[in-house]
Amino acid sequence: MKRLYSFLAGILAIILVLWGISYHLDSKINSRDSQKLVIYNWGDYIDPELLEKFTEETGIQVQYETFDSNEAMYTKIKQGGTTYDVAIPSEYMINKMKDEDLLVPLDYSKIEGIENIGPEFLNQSFDPNNQYSIPYFWGTLGIVYNETMVEEAPEHWDDLWKPEYKNSIMLFDGAREVLGLGLNSLGYSLNSKDPQQLEETVDKLYELTPNIKAIVADEMKGYMIQNNAAIGVTFSGEASQMLEKNPNLKYVVPTEASNLWFDNMVIPKTVKNQDAAYAFINFMLKPENALKNAEYVGYSTPNNAAKEMLPEETKEDKSFYPDADTMKHLEVYEKFDHKWTGIYSDLFLQFKMYRK
């Protein structure tokens, strides 16, 4: 019997030792995870020095992963199996993710610095009261042009139809963007669901065909930077990168109407470290950090405290910081259901096929 007790005691001792090792390893892993932040963002969309600064200030290591489209980001988070703590989707995707319960409602008792964000960038239709997102960058859809290749600068959407721009215009390859500029040129909302307005818009876009050089996406940068196209319809962030590399380029936002876009910080349901997520959001809300990020990326900051620290020529540039009157005429893309997404896509596809 003593041998049995000794044997059982030995087994128990081994179990306790193994449990202790397992507990120690789990504690180390949990401790390491609690000191790690996983960010899911667009490529080259943050100053790398800010990530280093965040780690220095908080002790939290950053794992930075990138995506190249909102759809790719959505799919990966929707499928699960990821541990992203913070993501940076665009406004229409925030709406979609919110409706599909993929985002964590924000706890504003843990957020510091929201007062630095301009009120004009808050409480947008895609996220009322900013229940799920905090503005990161914003911008517009407009016209970039080469002043050495046009006699008169295009300032309005209607200008694109001028005969002197034959085979000169690069359009962004997007249904909402192209149909939107057509709708705006006729005085309609870029979110129109009026069949008559859409028919009128498509007819007018067909008339633009002789002026279109190509319908492209990222390739537009190369064309414009290398003086291979006179005019492009693109987003302000893309335009700022083009202007930086070609002094002949200018960017203008048609004052009659255009698109206002946002990329916002959210906490996905995949979050593993909420404390680190809030720490990062608060870090990016600090004016000095938002300023550094805006100067590196070249996009417009929604942080008004940071904007005040920008060079005068930058913050007074109405192309990237439009005045209040222009802002009144800008619209975000409203989320379309499957039916209307299909209608816009079909109309755009028909337009592209026609011009060939």
What annotation goes with each model-predicted range?
Residues 7, 20-96, 109:
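Early extracytoplasmic/lumenal segment of secretory-pathway proteins
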Residues 142-149, 183-187, 261-273, 281-284, ...:
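A bilobed periplasmic-binding-protein/Venus flytrap-type ligand-binding module shared by bacterial periplasmic
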Residues 83, 88-211, 215-228:
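Extracytoplasmic ligand-binding site segments that recognize negatively charged/polar headgroups
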Residues 93-96, 225-226, 231-248:
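A ligand-binding cleft/hinge motif common to bilobed small-molecule-binding domains
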Residues 98-105, 127-131, 242-253, 315-318:
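Ligand-binding "clamshell"
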Residues 198-207, 245-269:
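Periplasmic-binding protein-like
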Residues 324-356:
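Conserved C-terminal helix/tail region of periplasmic/extracytoplasmic solute-binding proteins
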Residues 268-328:
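Mature extracytoplasmic/periplasmic domains
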